[in-house]
Curated annotation (Swiss-Prot):
The active site is at residues 372, 397. Pfam families: PDZ_6, Peptidase_S41. GO terms for biological process: proteolysis. GO terms for molecular function: serine-type endopeptidase activity. This is C-terminal processing peptidase, chloroplastic. It is found in: Plastid, Chloroplast thylakoid lumen. The lineage of its organism: Eukaryota, Viridiplantae, Chlorophyta, core chlorophytes, Chlorophyceae. GO terms for cellular component: chloroplast thylakoid lumen.
């Protein structure tokens, strides 16, 4: 998701590239920094957690003016339904990352669909748009009916009714739907769902081959209603588990933090003068994350803790700009993330020299549920040598989508680019490898529990 704003002027905030309708974004190879004033424009970007469909959206609610331009249209009169179809076609034409369009002639497809697909009613037009996008064979470039677009926006705002599962595809050819991350404290996490679990059925409906939006619809529902989810651990299809879950409406608290005192020597940085560690848990990147993280790092910096533990385990991403903002709080200079499309590197987001704490020893906890904007953050901290990455390899979700609003309230999520770390590593399907191998469950995620373990004989060696 990434649309950024005038690269030639000073700033654009970064995570989710900004929003200048992606369609209007021009190639920019110079480094761009961002200002706090740009923050609000970034807030509508990328996916979010409670049943957040794992899109990795970068501009989740970006309104893009999709003009028909000068492209030649059929000689016959164009109906209002066909105009809506053309809006969707043009959104992909302008922004899609693969300019070969999966080996198809995008212009020829437009003409073919206008001539052959019935578009007399809105439902038929929607169906024609879905068929057009299916040609791309890209599960993340999808049509969003008005209700689904509204649900996506609610997710990036921080609350949604569901069972607390963020879902995505497994990356293989089977189109299995897997748990990207269970939302902390959500019904699914409490029932034992884990990152990487394969979802088999939802209320008896087999989900393999369904779109993520269809599965999301099955999982969402009225607050306090029940839903049955059958799943299994990766590689163990014969060992299914059945979870009886109660849907809840929650507001996601993106940041929690504390100071752990009397920390065991094994968990401290070498030569630490204090037995204190600052622990910051980032559960998601939503519209509240930047301000909350700023408060956390500012307070811990004032305390002069011996080290920082940044926990982004099971953080499935969210607003790309928030991920970059957090990186800027910890890194004072250098590149943080590269945005690449079919033509190569198009944008570079860098530190802005206004970090809160760029010196305190830092370890970043990750696992297979660390994805998208969280991987951007982990990659930035690793490649800048700001901190050690501890845990297991992250998920590997590096595609960027932007959501283009259509005139009737529907939208199209379009894959527009991909993330790369400052060292040029393509995150997608690869992830970020840890510097320190660590059992991802060695530390709890609640504040009291993590301090208890860090102060015990079971404290892990975090800083190498």
């Amino acid at each position: 998701m990434h649309s950024r704003t005038n690269c030639l002027q000073t700033s654009v905030r970064a995570p989710q590239p900004h929003f200048r309708p992606f369609t209007a974004v021009k190639t920019c190879r110079q480094r761009c920094s961002t200002t706090a004033a740009a923050a609000k424009r970034d807030q509508a970007q990328e996916q979010q957690p409670w049943i957040q469909v794992g899109l990795g959206l970068a501009a989740a609610a970006t309104a893009v003016a999709v003009g028909l331009g000068a492209a030649a249209l059929p000689a016959q009169a164009v109906t209002s339904e066909q105009l809506l179809f053309l809006e969707a076609w043009r959104a992909v034409d302008r922004a899609y990352v693969d300019k070969s369009f999966n080996g198809q002639s995008w212009f020829k497809l437009r003409e073919t669909y206008l001539k052959k697909e019935p578009m007399d009613r809105r439902a038929q037009t929607y169906d024609a748009i879905r068929k057009l996008l299916a040609v791309l064979d890209d599960p993340f470039t999808r049509f969003l009916e008005p209700s689904r677009l509204a649900a996506l926006r609610r997710g990036t705002a921080g609350s949604v009714t569901g069972v607390g599962l963020e879902i995505t595809y497994d990356g293989g050819s089977g189109k299995d739907v897997v748990v990207l991350t269970p939302a902390p404290g959500g019904p699914a996490e409490k029932a034992g769902a884990r990152a990487g679990d394969v979802i088999v059925t939802v209320d008896g409906t087999a989900v393999k081959g369904l779109s993520l939006y269809d599965v999301s619809d099955l999982l969402q529902g009225e607050a306090d209603s029940q839903v049955e989810v059958v799943l299994h651990a990766p590689g163990a299809p014969s060992n299914t588990r059945t979870l009886q879950l109660t849907r809840q409406k929650v507001t996601i608290n993106p940041v929690t933090f504390t100071t752990c005192s009397n920390v065991a020597a094994a968990a401290l940085p070498p030569g630490a003068a204090k037995q204190q560690l600052g622990y910051v848990r980032l559960a998601t990147f939503n519209s509240n994350t930047t301000a909350a993280a700023q408060q956390a790092f500012t307070e811990l910096s004032k305390q002069g803790v011996a080290g920082l533990v940044l926990d982004i385990r099971n953080n499935g991403g969210g607003l790309f700009p928030a991920g970059v903002n957090v990186a800027r709080m910890l890194v004072d200079r250098g590149d943080l993330v590269l945005i690449a499309d079919s033509q190569g590197i198009r944008d570079i987001y860098s530190a802005d020299g206004n970090s809160i704490d760029s010196a305190t020893p830092l370890v970043v906890l990750v696992n297979r549920g660390t994805a998208s904007a969280s991987e951007v953050l982990a990659g930035a901290l690793k490649d800048s040598k700001r901190g050690l990455i501890a845990g297991e390899r992250t998920f590997g979700k590096g595609l960027i989508q932007t959501v283009v609003d259509l005139s009737d309230g529907s939208g199209v999520a379009v894959t527009v680019a991909r993330y790369q770390t400052p060292a040029g590593v393509d995150i997608n399907k690869i992830g970020v490898s840890p510097d320190v191998q660590l059992d991802p469950e060695v530390l709890p995620t609640d504040l009291e529990g993590v301090c208890r373990v860090l102060g015990s004989d079971a404290a892990p060696r975090l800083f190498g």
